[in-house]
Amino acid sequence: MKSLTSGVLALGMVLAVTPAFAQAAGEKGPERIVWAAHKTPDSPYTKPNRPIWHIADILKAHQGKQSWDQQILLTRDYDGHYVSMAPGEKTKCMFYADDRVFGWIYSGQVKITIDGQQPFTANKGYLFDVAPRLSYCLENTGTEPVVFYRSTPAGQVPSYPESETPTPIKGWVYGKAKITSTGGYEEPNQPFLDFNAYATGGGKSRDFAFDGHTAAHIIRSGNVKALPPSTSWGHFHENMVEAWVVIEGQLDVLITGEPLVTGELGDVIQANNERWHRATCHPNIGSCTRLAMTPRNKEGQVHYFQTGQPPGN
C-alpha cells in the first residue's frame, strides 16, 4: 500500500511539471496589435493575372468559336481557366492525386461524371467540386456551348484511369503505376450545388470546396446604400492570393494600388498577396455573391486589419 501511495505521489509530481501542449487554435482569439510586412513595391500582377478579368472581354476574344480554353489565373495554389465546350464535346476522364477540381457554370449545361457518384447535369449557376483521386469526365449534352470557370491545382498534371490514353504534356512522360488510395466526400463538400436555387431559397454564406489545401467559399452579402469610405481598406493576407468569381449581382473591390473595380456576373477579381482588399456589393443593386478562393483555410487563416478601423473593416 505504501508503494502505491508513493507511485501516485510521483505521478502527480510529473504531471505538475509537464507542459500543457493542448492549445486550441482559431480565428476568433483575443485582439492584438502586430507588425506585418508588405512587399515594396506591391506584389506585381504577372500574366495571366490581373486585378479583374471581365467575362465580356473573354467571350469577345473567342467570338465565333464554340470550343476554347483561356487561363486567367495562376497562383502558387490555383490554376484558373474559363473554358467553352461545343455541343457534343467530351473530355477524357482524369483526376488529380491530392487536390480538388472545382468550378462554376456561367452558361449552358454540362454532364459531369465523377467516380462513385451518379452523373449529373450542371446548368447555369451550378457549382461543382471533384474530390481528390476521383476521376471525372465532362460532356456537353446541350444544344449550345457551355462556358464555365474551372480551378485545378497549380503546377500539377492530371492522372488518368488505365482505360484512357493520357494527353501528352511537354516535359512529362506517363507510365503505369498502382495506387490504393481513393477519394470521397465529407461535409461541407458535395459534388454539386445548384447555386441559383440555393440563393432563391435564402441560402447563406458557407464553405463549398474545403480541405487542408483548397478553400472555396460562397460569400453572400446584402444590399448596401453606399460604399465604405476610401480610408477603409478591408484586410490583407501574408503570402496568399485571394480571388473571387462573381456568381450573383455586382461586386465592388478596392485593392491596394488599383482603382476601384466593379465585377459583373462571371467576372474574376484577384487581390495579390500582401495587398489590402475590400469587397462589397455594388450599392443599391441588391444582394451579391462571390466564390472566394484562398488556400489553407481549414487550419485557420490570418486576416490583417487596420488598427484605426472598426473590427472586420
Question: For each of these PLM feature ranges, what is it?
Answer:
Residues M1-V8:
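Bacterial N-terminal signal peptides that target proteins for export
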Residues T18-A22:
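Sec/Tat signal peptide C-region and signal peptidase I cleavage site
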